[in-house]
Each structure stands twice: as C-alpha cells, then as structure tokens.
C-alpha cells in the first residue's frame, strides 16, 4: 500500500513537470527578404514600399483645379559609393489620370481629382519622365519629394469618397 502511494506520487510529479515543460511561452518565425541590386546605393527598407497619408481633403479646395496641401515623402539611400556614379534620377510610373496624363489617377469612390508629384523645389514631375539629376554624397542620401491632390479642372465634378493611387519609382544612376 505504501509502495502504491509512492508510485502514485512519483507519477503525478513527473506528469506535472512534463506539463510545465509543454506550456507555450512564446514562439514565432523570422523571415528575411530583400534583393541584391546593381547600384551604388542601397534603398532603405522603409523607402521601398511606403504609404503617404494625404488626409481628408475638402472637395471645395479641389474645385476649378484647386490643390490640397502637399505631403512630403522621401526615398532614403544608404551606403552610397560615389566613386564612379555621382548622380541619380527618379522616374515615377503608375496609372495616369484620364483628365491629365502627367498626373497619377486615383481609384476608389472619390473622383474628379488626380495626384501630382513634385521634386524638392516644388516642380511637378510628369509620370514616366525622369527628374533632374540629383548629386549623391558618399554614405546616406535622402531624395525628397512631395505629392498633392489636384482637382481635374473647371469642368470636373469632384465627388467625395475614399481614394488610393499607386506610383512605382525607378532610380537611374549616372
């Protein structure tokens, strides 16, 4: 009888300790992605795929080709080596606006406006056209741009609603 109690206590002790070891105290997975590019600079991960919040823009501000406030965005370049290539141009592409092929079209429930992209001097950048060359420095560099929503003109009806637009960028080093 005494032996049975000892055996029962031993089985319970080992059973409880194995349950404690089996408890999930956290787990996960780390996936590393990227690409190797033939360029004098690396593109910072936060610049490769970003979202620019345009905000809630009054339809009145867009009447007759009116513009929203510009929203700045950057393309950050890292570890640049300018020993051979010293400048970079940026080309933005995307679905062009039906009202103005130089601007980026919007999709969604909103309509009657388009996205304009500008360089750091507030000069409009036409879709599919390279910017003026920007001089690079060794190390890290920041390419500054801005975007604003622009009404499609006097004859356009600006319809309130949500919108999105996607622009791809390509860098070319000289």
From Swiss-Prot:
Position of the signal peptide: 1-22
Source domain of life: Bacteria
GO BP terms, alphabetized: cell adhesion involved in single-species biofilm formation
InterPro entries the record matches: Adhesion_dom_fimbrial (IPR000259), Adhesion_dom_fimbrial_sf (IPR036937), Adhesion_dom_sf (IPR008966), Bact_Fimbrial_Adh_Pro (IPR050263)
Subcellular location: Fimbrium
One Pfam family of this chain: Fimbrial
GO CC list: pilus
SUPFAM superfamilies hit by this protein: Bacterial adhesins (SSF49401)
Keywords, ordered alphabetically: Disulfide bond, Fimbrium, Signal
Covalent S-S links between cysteines: 41-80
Family: Belongs to the fimbrial protein family.
Role description: Major structural component of mannose-resistant fimbriae of Serratia marcescens.
UniProt-recorded name of the protein: Fimbria A protein
Lineage summary: Bacteria, Pseudomonadati, Pseudomonadota, Gammaproteobacteria, Enterobacterales
């Amino acid at each position: 009888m005494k032996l049975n109690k000892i055996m029962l206590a031993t089985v319970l002790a080992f059973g409880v300790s194995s349950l404690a070891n089996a408890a999930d105290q956290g787990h996960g997975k780390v996936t590393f992605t990227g690409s190797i590019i033939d360029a004098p600079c690396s593109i910072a991960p936060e610049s490769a795929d970003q979202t620019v919040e345009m905000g809630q823009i009054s339809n009145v501000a867009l009447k007759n080709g009116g513009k929203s406030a510009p929203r700045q965005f950057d393309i950050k370049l890292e570890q640049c080596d300018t020993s051979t290539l010293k400048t970079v141009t940026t080309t933005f592409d995307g679905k062009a606006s039906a009202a103005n092929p130089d601007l980026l079209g919007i999709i969604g429930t909103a309509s009657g406006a388009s996205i304009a992209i500008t360089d750091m001097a507030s000069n409009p950048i036409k879709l599919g056209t390279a910017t003026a060359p920007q001089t690079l420095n060794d190390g890290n560099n920041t390419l500054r741009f801005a975007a604003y929503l622009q009404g499609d003109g006097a004859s356009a009806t600006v319809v309130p609603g949500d919108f999105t637009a996607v622009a791809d960028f390509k860098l070319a080093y000289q």
